[in-house]
């Protein structure tokens, strides 16, 4: 086909060869040729425009169809993501409330721990003070015992001296008795001498009377004779008689005076000797009595001091016994508190270790999810580039956040793990349900499976021969313990059945050892039942373990942004067909009403299972999330079943709202 530009030189060449042209003609011809060229170009342009419009119409039709398909897919994904975001917001709210409550409980526990620690420190100070006081009292007791031993030795010495003094007193009393006897003898002799003196005086008077009578008789005879004698010789006889009488009287008086003097001298000498000996004896007796009195006074004072010391010693011993009893009680209390604190600390360490393990597992899951989200983001970006679609600002923002998060995860994985550990919390709690229909109740069940404790709460003895304790953990085989045929549980008594692995001693009727079983078993759902001899269940206790996990709101918001980014993306195969893209969905059972909440979007193809287990003190939600993407043969497609993860969320406090006020319904 010949173009107008190819035809124009031929025509102009022919005209130029036929006739000469004027400049005006030439100018017009050139303008004509220019117009023809422009017309040809316009025709070609119009043809091209028409063909392009036809192609554009076809493309618009295809674009419209593609946009309708994409809008349908995006609307479905958006609905699913909005439902998912609603559930996530509710979960975040509940998790935030639970975290606040757990923080309050943690602060209370820390305050209690500080208070108990302060009390323990105070008790230890009191114990040290009591020990110091005990040492002082022991030193005082030793000094008092030394003083008592000294007083006892002095008492023994004084008792020896008293014994010697008593011997001396006995000797002196014997000497005094002998002196008294001698004094009595001397007094008897004096009385005898006085009697003799009186007798001699009476004899002397009698002799005087006799002599006077004889003298009168002689006088009378002489007078009668004188009458007869001469008066001349009367005076001679009278003078001679007077002289003889005077001489006889003088002799008698001299003899009596001499005898009297001898008696008085002998009596006075003996009396002086007796008085001197009596004075000596009385002085000795007085000294002995005085020494005896002083000894008695000293013995009385020492006895009073000894009794006072004995009373003080008894009081000190009673006080020492009281202090020892109080010290023993304080030691027992301190040991019990320390044992409880050590047990609580061991439990807290075990729980912390368990939580750290769970945190590590959750971090690993989070890292895997971050890698999968990053891979999904790359796939979506590849599809957008292939379809030449401009990314939304949210996608760009999410892509920037994902790139920064990826760099942080690659460059500082330990920092991310540490931040995750600090921004999330997990707690394991146990809830117990007990029921009793008889006298005996299941009082305590060990979480580690070491023992089962029963108590007779009635005022009567209970025969438990051939009774059974049945223990089961979830779907595990049933464990049965049978009591001895003659076993009886006293009123108010407690019996503990130990597993053989607990290391307890068999001491009936308070401690029994199940030698056939090393442990009672441990797990998340322990049911212990007491069966009587007729096969009737009279008591039951169920122990349920719940795990509570709380994550920081910032991390959840980042996950929400990543989910929003996934909502706004789309996947297509290389041939233009939409790929099946199954993101997250969740099925949750209400802990109060028990009804499921179906929030999965239609056409998403996600299959997620969840359940809630609620007890008297804790509730938990197990959420399983599945991701599946089936792409075409494009370079950005993935295989099936990328990841399936299970999470355990929960609230340690029981739900108090009714089914009408259920947040899910």
UniProtKB/Swiss-Prot annotation:
N6-acetyllysine: modified positions: 32, 78, 97, 108, 114, 123, 135, 144, 155, 171, 180, 201, 208, 233, 260, 265, 270, 311, 316, 341, 417, 450, 457, 486
* Residue intervals of the LTD domain: 428-545
Lipidation annotated as S-farnesyl cysteine: which positions? 662
- Cite the residue spans of the region called Tail: 384-665
Cross-link entry Glycyl lysine isopeptide (Lys-Gly) (interchain with G-Cter in SUMO2), positions: 32, 97, 171, 201, 208, 219, 233, 260, 270, 311, 366, 378, 417, 420, 450, 470, 486, 599
Q: Where in the cell is it found?
A: Nucleus lamina; Nucleus envelope; Nucleus, Nucleoplasm; Nucleus matrix
Q: Where is this region: Coil 1B?
A: 81-218
> Where in the chain is the Glycyl lysine isopeptide (Lys-Gly) (interchain with G-Cter in SUMO1) cross-link?
599
Numbered residues of crosslink Glycyl lysine isopeptide (Lys-Gly) (interchain with G-Cter in SUMO) = 201
Could you tell me which residues carry Cysteine methyl ester?
662
Q: Where is this region: Linker 1?
A: 71-80
Question: At what residues does the UniProt record annotate the site feature described as Cleavage?
Answer: 647-648
Region entry Coil 2: which residue ranges? 243-383
Which residues are reported to carry the modification N-acetylmethionine?
1
* Residue segments, region Coil 1A: 34-70
GO terms for molecular function, please?
Answer: protein phosphatase 1 binding; structural constituent of cytoskeleton; structural constituent of nuclear lamina
Q: Which GO terms describe its biological process?
A: cellular response to hypoxia; cellular senescence; DNA double-strand break attachment to nuclear envelope; establishment or maintenance of microtubule cytoskeleton polarity; heterochromatin formation; muscle organ development; negative regulation of adipose tissue development; negative regulation of cardiac muscle hypertrophy in response to stress
Q: Where, per the database record, does this protein carry Phosphothreonine?
A: 3, 10, 19, 416, 496, 505, 510, 548
A single GO CC term for this protein reads: nucleus
Q: Where is this region: Interaction with MLIP?
A: 1-130
- In this chain, the stretch annotated as Linker 2 covers 219-242
| Every IF rod domain range | 31-387
The family assignment reads: Belongs to the intermediate filament family.
For this entry, the protein name equals: Prelamin-A/C
Name its species: Rattus norvegicus
> Per UniProt, what is the name of the gene that codes for the protein in this document?
Lmna
